[in-house]
Structure formats: structure tokens, C-alpha cells
Amino acid sequence: SNPERQAYVAALAAERESGSAASSNPDPVLSLEVGRKRLRDAGGAFLDEGQVWTASLSQTFEWPERLRLRRAIADRQIEAAKLGLGRFEQALEAKAAVLAYRLSRAQVRAQACEEVAARFAGLRKALVGRDPSGPAPTIELRSVEAAEVVARRRAEEARLALQQALLEMNQLRGAPSLAPLTVKAPVLALKDAPKLEELLAAAQQGNFSYRMHVLESEQLSLQSDLARSDSVPGFTAGPYVSQDRVGGRETIVGLRFDIPLPVSGRSSAAERSANERRRQSKSAISAAWRDVEKDLGQTWLSYASKVDQLRMHKDDPAVRFSEAAKLAESHFRAGALSLQLFMDAQAGYLEAVDSALLIQEQAVEAGFRLRELSGVPFNPVASR
């Protein structure tokens, strides 16, 4: 139901239709000429007048080698359209997975901010009933109010991010923009990436950008061969019949044969131009492969780094800091903890949530980016 995917499917269908006609000769041409003829003698005296007409049927024939080259060029265009569709479907799947993760994590982030804001609101109400004598109670109250404002702002930002992710997800699904959607927050286990050497080997066939450069080079090579074959062009042949009814009836039946003469040098110029473009495309292939090696190496290192960071903690640091934030509240209300430590615990909880979710999101994106760059069916996320 995704409209962009339908556009790629339509483009592939169009290339297939064009390819089906690439290896066939043009349609025959029927020509008809009709006129009148007036016959006079040498002195200008009128002798006779009547109708004349000519009809011909002609067919242009291409040499088999030229038809083969045209079909091969069309096959490369079809393969390029298939690659485009496959790349889009792969990117669509990856984007849907990342958006689903982002949607669930935005819910977690919003809940954490609202939880902290509620704690500060409860503490603010408790501080209002204290004896306001001296500057310390007032400063403490204002500090708590400021922290509550910051927590509510972050909660609002998290809710906005949630709505933005929802809009993007509904666009991908082809659903109404504000259609409700709930995604359960998964407990993720990130897989180890394949070895970099394996990814690079697979990228020679699986990387879209590199494959497109290779296909373009192959297509230009075929076009160069096609331009070279212009020195032996196709020919047109067919029967014709003409009739003249002036001064009697004269009928002529014959065979017509036409062949272009390559005397202008256009075919050789086209061949030289195609050869230059082919050499240029080979240089572009080398540059494209260097880009693949660089992007794949950087993404592989980034993914491995993020996975190592997440595996440093056996449990979710956000959960551990959440428990510490709750414990800090109970101890502060009991008078066993200072206000500063209480506020530090709440701020640390929010920072831990943001950091953990950000690293997880970056790891998921890097994992799917590895799949996009290499073409390996690697799913970085495994639900526990």
C-alpha cells in the first residue's frame, strides 16, 4: 500500500514492456501514392488523361547482432529497475523497524520524564507547607519548581517525538496520519555483526550503489558495441506495385531495397563517444568501491562500539537508575537525604534513560545500515 513502492513496481513493469520490444524489428510500413497524369504530344495537343497510383509494403530488418545488443541493454535496464525496487523494499523494512523502535522508546522516555515531574510536583507541594523563614526554604522551593519545569518540558518533547514517529510510521503503512498505533517496548539483544571481510565480499553483489555503477558500465560497453555496428546498418526491403492508366494500362511490380550509406562519419563519432563514456564509467566503479569500503568499515566499527557499550551493563541502566530515583525520594521524605542528592538522583535517572535509549537507537540504525551497504540479510535486533 506504500505509494512510493507502487511507483518502483510501475517503473519495473515499464522497463519489462520496453525490453520485450527491444529485440524485434520495427513494424512494416504501408505506403500509397495516388495522382492524375495528363499526356500531350510534342506540339502540346491533348492526348489522354487518367489516374496513376503506387502502393508499397516495406520492412526494416536489423542484423541479429544489433538485436542481441539492444536486448542486452534492455536487460540491464530491467535489472537496474529490480535493484531499485529491492533497495527500496529493504530500506522500507529497515525504516519501519527503526521507527517502531523509536516509537516504543519515545513512550519510555515520556513516561520517565512524567514520572520525575510528578515526583518534583509532590515535593513542591510538601515544601510549600514548610516554615518559609530564612532564605534556604525559598531557594529549595524555587530549585524544585525549576526542576519540575525542566522535567515537564522534556516530557513534552518526548511526546512530540512520539507523535512525529507515529506520523512517519503511518505514512509507511499507508494509514491515516493520526491513526492510533501502539508498539510494545521490546527488551533488545543486539547480535554481533558478521566479519567485515564477509560484508565486503557480499557488497560486491549486494551494494546498490556499486551494482548500479557496474550495470551502467556494462550498459555503456554494450552501447559502444552497438555504435560500432552502425557501420553495417540495417536495410529496408519490400514489394511495390504501380499502375498508369494514361494512353493504355501499364502495371509495374517490383522489389524495393534501401540501405543507408555511412559516409558522414556519424557512426564512428558515436563509437568514440561511447568508448570514452565506458572508460569514464570504469573509473567511477573504482571510486564507488572505495566509498563502499569506507562507509562499510565506519558503520561496522560504529555498530561494534555501540554493542560493546550496551554489553558493559548486565542490566538496563535506565531501570537501575529508576530504582535509585525512587529510593532517593523515599529517603528524602524520611529526612535521610539532602535535597541536592535527591535532585541529582532524578537528573541522573533522566540522563541515563536518554543515553541508554540513544545508544540503543544508534546501534539499531547502524545494524540496518550494515545490511543496506552489504546486502547481507542481517537483522541486528533479536528480542529476548
Feature map (PLM): residue ranges:
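Alpha-helical hairpins and coiled-coil heptad-repeat segments
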Residues: 124-141, 324-342
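C-terminal hydrophobic structural anchor segments
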Residues: 304-336
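A glycine-/polar-enriched beta->alpha junction
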Residues: 1-6, 13-28, 55-73, 82-90, ...
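Periplasmic alpha-helical coiled-coil/stalk elements that build and connect Gram-negative outer-membrane
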Residues: 85-206, 299-306, 349, 356, ...
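Small/polar, glycine/serine/threonine/aspartate-rich low-complexity segments that form flexible
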Residues: 31-66, 70, 182-195, 235-273, ...
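Short, charged, amphipathic alpha-helical segments
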Residues: 71-75, 138-147, 339-347
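Acidic, low-complexity, intrinsically disordered peripheral segments
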Residues: 353-384
